[in-house]
Design a protein with these regions (language model features):
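Sec-dependent N-terminal signal peptides
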Residues: 1-5
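Sequence context surrounding c-type heme c attachment/ligation sites in exported
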Residues: 7-185, 203, 224, 237, ...
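Short edge beta-strand/loop segments characteristic of extracellular beta-sandwich folds
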Residues: 63-67, 190-199
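Generic recognition of long tandem-repeat/solenoid scaffolds
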Residues: 108-113, 192-196, 226-230
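Long, charge-rich C-terminal accessory regions
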Residues: 187-188, 244
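Alpha-glucan (starch/glycogen) binding determinants
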Residues: 200-257
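Alpha-helical transmembrane segments
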Residues: 281-297
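Cytoplasmic C-terminal tails of single-pass
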Residues: 297-314
């Protein structure tokens, strides 16, 4: 009975510390933070935005903006990009989309953003590769806990989806090559050289920014259909965003904002040095053990000699 009383208060409560970014369907809007059947409606407003036209296999951007935000004392707010709200099999990947990056520095459809004190609006952006020809709805959803995380979680979703019509790619449309994958991660303090392959492009202009900041143009060099440019290093583990304006015989195109996240250097192990150090420790242990054993044997030998001498004298 005591155990049940201890467990019951937490069964419907939210996890104020979040679950981390990941690939989750809408069901996780409650199940990850408690019982999905005990969700309450969030008072926040969720709006999803995307171009109404995209081209098969090319990149486009989708954003979710949440206003009237209420969240836990930790400031975490979970954002979902979804292909429907059925609760299962409703990630963008299930509908054929491929997530290239998001503005929080990952490649997942679910991200947790840290909301500052007094902040009531926040936007998360995704760069995605379009699926096959057809019409595709996309939804935005959120979940969050109460102020102290002690009660049932809140879940909210966009009232209407944005419907994207995916069309065949026009023959002369300036575009990034299908095989191009923008870098998503790098180490703090390192500049990044981006080598960008294109098709039907004869001019490129690239600009970068800190999220929400002013854009700065960078020099671009070309080699046929390949274009190269450098993105500056950051001194902190923060993200920068960049995009390219592409010109050619067809209509001018602008890529989505790509996010490049800087991370602290990861601690690495020199396997050879670790192996040699381990062997040295084993040998040192064996030498110490043999030395102790030899000392013990010598001591036992001296005791036996003393006993023998006493017996002879007797």
């Amino acid at each position: 009975m005591v155990a049940m009383l201890l467990v019951l208060p937490t069964m419907g409560s939210a996890n104020p510390n979040g679950v981390g970014s990941g690939t989750f369907d809408a069901q996780c809007g409650g199940a990850c933070h408690g019982d999905a059947d005990m969700n309450r409606s969030s008072p926040a407003t969720v709006e999803v935005n995307a171009p109404t036209i995209a081209y098969e296999g090319l990149l486009t951007s989708v954003s979710i903006t949440v206003s009237d935000i209420e969240t836990t004392t930790s400031g975490l707010l979970g954002f979902f990009l979804l292909s429907d709200l059925s609760g299962a099999g409703d990630t963008p990947d299930d509908a054929g989309w491929t997530i290239i990056s998001n503005s929080e520095g990952g490649t997942e459809n679910y991200v947790e953003a840290l909301i500052g004190a007094g902040q009531t609006t926040h936007t998360v952006e995704w760069t995605v590769r379009a699926p096959g020809i057809g019409e595709y709805p996309l939804y935005g959803a959120i979940h969050h806990g109460t102020e102290d995380g002690s009660e049932a979680p809140f879940f909210g979703a966009s009232t209407t989806p944005v419907v994207v019509e995916v069309r065949p790619v026009p023959e002369d449309l300036p575009r990034l090559a299908a095989e191009f994958e923008p870098p998503a991660l790098r180490t703090v303090g390192e500049t990044t050289t981006v080598v960008m392959s294109t098709a039907f492009v004869n001019g490129v202009q690239v600009e970068w920014r800190l999220p929400g900041g002013e854009a700065t143009t960078v020099p671009v060099s070309s080699d046929g259909d390949t274009w190269s440019f450098e993105l500056p290093a950051t001194l902190q583990p923060v993200a920068i965003q960049w995009r390219a304006h592409l010109t050619g015989e067809g209509p001018e195109q602008t890529t989505p904002w790509f996010t490049l996240q800087s991370e602290e250097p990861r601690w690495t192990v020199n396997e050879s040095a670790a192996y040699l150090q381990s062997m040295a420790m084993v040998l040192a242990f064996m030498a110490a053990f043999l030395s102790l054993q030899r000392g013990r044997n010598d001591e036992e030998s001296l005791v036996k000699d003393d006993v023998f001498e006493e017996e002879v004298e007797a």
